[in-house]
Amino acid sequence: MDLYPEENTQSEQSQNSENNMQIFKSENSDGFSSDLMISNDQLKNISKTQLTLEKEKIFKMPNVLSQVMKKAFSRKNEILYCVSTKELSVDIHDATGKVYLPLITKEEINKRLSSLKPEVRKTMSMVHLGAVKILLKAQFRNGIDTPIKIALIDDRINSRRDCLLGAAKGNLAYGKFMFTVYPKFGISLNTQRLNQTLSLIHDFENKNLMNKGDKVMTITYVVGYALTNSHHSIDYQSNATIELEDVFQEIGNVQQSEFCTIQNDECNWAIDIAQNKALLGAKTKTQIGNNLQIGNSASSSNTENELARVSQNIDLLKNKLKEICGE
């Protein structure tokens, strides 16, 4: 009886008639399995063999069994490294924190997989999320005070605090704002809400700057990920969870998923990360907000102090840019 039909699986069966051993292997998008069957007579022969412990080799097995075990439980590590980049203009009506932008989708992954050989494609079961770089660029002149808050969340997670992958607050007064997040985890391609795994929420605070229909900024993002046949295929570099690009650190701050203390005066802020937000570009509906407080809520500042700090940070950035340009 064939335990692993060939349809939709990569299977392998080998048999050693002399030693009465059988190996069954199966690998598809649902995962990997391997079974080793040894007859009772052969098992008795193996049990009579003395196993010894050595410093270099934890277990020393009979050559035949060692070879069979190696063949039974070995598999090829299939890895497809991918980099996806997209750019889109955002209507000011959609920049109020009420919609989300999926940074990686099932449709995109399926398109990637379609380019692989069938025998490799059907083994792919995981996507490993390495890094996300996000650039916001204003579609208006420099110098206008335009604070913006951004959060990258895993919207599959019900807890609004635990879903946070990273959050940042900045200002588009100097035209653009950029930061990078390192999720560094893998998920099954069969997870139900894959499109919600990397959800970008953005809240443009100067909501009266333009009218509905006007494009207020451009979002450009790059996602680095890998498609593999195992959850154990990838080792991640030891980067920070989230970071601001150097030149933008003077006018922004970040919050890691660990909620560490931010060394910045302007660290008390909140962003609505309620679940079930509408997709960017879709019709929105009224919903109850769920503001996540970032930083220490015990200290608050009035509007004048907030603007004064923004102005001070902009001056610091201006001086830094002069130093860079050698002025």
UniProtKB/Swiss-Prot annotation:
GO terms for biological process: transport of virus in host, cell to cell. Transports viral genome to neighboring plant cells directly through plasmosdesmata, without any budding. The movement protein allows efficient cell to cell propagation, by bypassing the host cell wall barrier. Acts by forming tubules structures that increase the size exclusion limit (SEL) of plasmodesmata, thereby allowing viral ribonucleocapsids to spread directly to neighboring cells. Pfam families: MP (PF01107). Its main location: host cell. Belongs to the caulimoviridae movement protein family. The keyword Cell membrane does not apply. One of its GO terms (cellular component) is host cell plasmodesma. It comes from the Viruses. Homotrimer, through the coiled-coil domain. Interacts with VAP. May interact (via N-terminus) with host prenylated Rab acceptor protein 1D (PRA1D). Residues 297-327 form a coiled coil. This is Movement protein. Keywords: Coiled coil, Host cell junction, Host-virus interaction, Transport, Viral movement protein. It is found in: Host cell junction, Host plasmodesma.
